[in-house]
């Protein structure tokens, strides 16, 4: 069986040596994607590359009349920060491959920290943010940001794969865990996550006042993209 091949086309110079890579793929409640959108809009990021694969649905997102790939890399070279931003919810069979792809890209560009995130549904609805680190340096960074280090737990998906592979390779990976809602635009979780990322990434900021609007827009686009992908797959086998 052939492994999925992810392709990057860089559109402009990228200089994020010793900086940060933020994983913005949607997770539970869409908060990861929404928080990434807020960082992009608030902190002056620009599209620097597109990511494509034959395993991705053939979907174009039209914004202000301009076609866009649903998965892109945004960069703020002055802050040394890159964001993998996506409106695609990847099937779990692609999670390990995407994690390896991110780690390879991070190594190529000299990234010091990869920041990923995932929503958890805490029984007591706690608002406390916790994080796990792949290395001692990553765990120290978490504590310096005033965030509790997760001591015991299970982290699935792309974040879990990034942690495991980062532990083996020595790449600093920080996985932020936040309390997630089951349904609806996840404004509260997005705000919590965005503030946590801004503590970890110097110079990054969030516009909390616009998060609610961005949450609704991002959720709508992600759901539409998922529906289009589902319809395409169903049409292939009729």
Residue spans for each PLM region:
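Gly/Ser/Thr-rich loops at beta-strand to alpha-helix junctions
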Residues: 25-30, 90-92, 119-124, 156, ...
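N-terminal short beta-loop-beta anion/metal-coordinating cradle
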Residues: 1-87
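Internal, conserved structured core segments that host functional sites
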Residues: 92-140
């Amino acid at each position: 069986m052939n492994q999925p091949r992810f392709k990057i086309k860089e559109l402009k110079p990228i200089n994020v040596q010793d900086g940060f890579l933020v994983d913005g793929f949607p997770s539970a409640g869409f908060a990861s994607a929404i928080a990434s959108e807020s960082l992009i809009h608030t902190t002056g990021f620009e599209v620097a590359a597109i990511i494509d694969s034959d395993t991705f649905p053939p979907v174009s997102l039209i914004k202000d009349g301009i076609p866009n790939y649903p998965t892109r890399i945004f960069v703020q070279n002055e802050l040394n920060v890159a964001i993998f931003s996506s409106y695609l919810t990847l099937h779990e069979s692609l999670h390990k491959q995407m994690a390896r792809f991110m780690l390879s890209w991070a190594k190529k560009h000299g990234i010091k920290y990869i920041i990923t995130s995932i929503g958890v549904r805490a029984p007591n609805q706690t608002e406390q943010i916790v994080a796990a680190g792949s290395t001692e340096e990553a765990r120290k960074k978490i504590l310096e940001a005033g965030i509790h280090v997760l001591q015991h737990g299970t982290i699935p998906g792309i974040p879990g794969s990034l942690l495991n592979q980062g532990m083996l390779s020595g790449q600093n990976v920080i996985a932020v865990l936040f309390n997630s809602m089951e349904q609806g635009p996840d404004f509260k979780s997005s705000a919590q996550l965005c503030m946590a990322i801004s503590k970890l990434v110097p110079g990054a900021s969030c516009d909390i006042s616009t998060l609610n609007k961005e949450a609704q827009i991002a959720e709508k686009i992600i759901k539409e993209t998922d529906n289009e992908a589902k319809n395409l797959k169903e049409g292939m086998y009729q």
